[in-house]
Amino acid sequence: MSPGSRRASPQSAREVVELDRDEAMRLLASVDHGRVVFTRAALPAIRPVNHLVVDGRVIGRTRLTAKVSVAVRSSADAGVVVAYEADDLDPRRRTGWSVVVTGLATEVSDPEQVARYQRLLHPWVNMAMDTVVAIEPEIVTGIRIVADSRTP
């Protein structure tokens, strides 16, 4: 039996607890990176992104030529539907949480806001991250994986 296919023992049983919107957004704000899911050639594409949560919006930086930037720019003012996922999972304890935000992503164009977010969001890679994208959450879901309260 491979390690990934082991059955959970009663001591390691876990349960899933649904998070409300406020708790999910608070947890999302507690980490600095996640994954943005967008459409590329009519198929889902996923990229890691560092982020901030400001005034209920998820803010990230990307390159002008990055696929996610191209998708956002191609939608003009309407925005493009994306999902953003972040988590904090402990594989050893089999606990943690995951949050998914789905909403419209638009390019931040106000020069003062762009400058502010560029100061606050530091790229992880050695490339010019010249585009700031804001995701306005429409749907916010989340789960917390905790020790099963029914386990003795």
Curated annotation (Swiss-Prot):
Induction: A member of the dormancy regulon. Induced in response to reduced oxygen tension (hypoxia) and low levels of nitric oxide (NO). It comes from the Bacteria. SUPFAM superfamilies: FMN-binding split barrel. InterPro entries: Pyridox_Oxase-rel, Split_barrel_FMN-bd. Gene3D superfamilies: Electron Transport, Fmn-binding Protein, Chain A. This is Uncharacterized protein MT0087. The lineage of its organism: Bacteria, Bacillati, Actinomycetota, Actinomycetes, Mycobacteriales.
